[in-house]
Amino acid sequence: MTNKEIESYRNSYKVVNGIGFCRVNNDINGNPRYVVHFLAFTTDEEMRNDNLSQRQLYAIAKKRANYLGFSVYRANWYGGGFVGQSYSLVDTANMINEIVNK
């Protein structure tokens, strides 16, 4: 990454209620989109469970992310993320925390 790309990433990354959001380009309709790492959709207990593989953790996270309207983010620079629309990161973070802690 170049210094310009690093600075751009720093400016587009926000942490809200313990969840990191990375701003990406708007969708085709102009709605703001954010990428969230898949581990934000898992509990600490699930991450510490040695019986769950990374693939199983990802499957759990994907089910929760899809329920909230997120889809798999396929860009190579950000591995293991889900992308969704959000006009309010606080509300989105609260929804993620609510479904994870259900």
Task: State each model region's role.
Residues 101-102:
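Short acidic DE-rich linear segments
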Residues 2-13:
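Negatively charged, low-complexity tracts enriched in Asp/Glu with abundant Ser/Thr
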